Amino acid sequence: MHDRRLKRLESALQRNPADALSATGWASRAGMSPRTFSRLFQRDTGMPFRQWRQQLRLLAALRRLAAEQRVNQVALELGYESTSAFVAMFRRALGTTPGRYFTM
């Protein structure tokens, strides 16, 4: 990310991927309008904030699962409402469940 305000957001979400603050909330924290935030975010990352955050969480999940953390623990640590919501996101993103992903 090029914009220093977006770099701070990236650092904060790397430290706490479960943070559920909306794009509007992050825009407010950064002192931007939601529209400016969306434009800058799209320009710097090539994707909308929501998609980027999902990818960040997915990468964090892969690291934790590779370290043999339990699926339900990973789901809760990353801010998912339930294990099933996490598994559904994982399946949509990678085409398989977390358990099967690591046995392929």
Language-model segment annotations:
Residues M1-L9, Q54-R57:
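N-terminal positioning helix adjacent to the helix-turn-helix/winged-helix DNA-binding module
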Residues A27-P34:
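Helix-turn-helix
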Residues P17, Q42-P48, R91, G95-T96:
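Alpha-helical hinge/cap motifs
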Residues F37, F41, A85-F86, F90:
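Short hydrophobic/aromatic patch on the recognition helix
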Residues A66-A67, A88-M104:
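…primarily DNA-binding HTH/wHTH and HhH modules…
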Residues H2-L6, R15, S22, V71:
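Hydrophobic alpha-helical connector segments
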Residues A20, T24, R43-T83, T103-M104:
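Terminal helix-turn-helix DNA-binding modules in bacterial transcription factors
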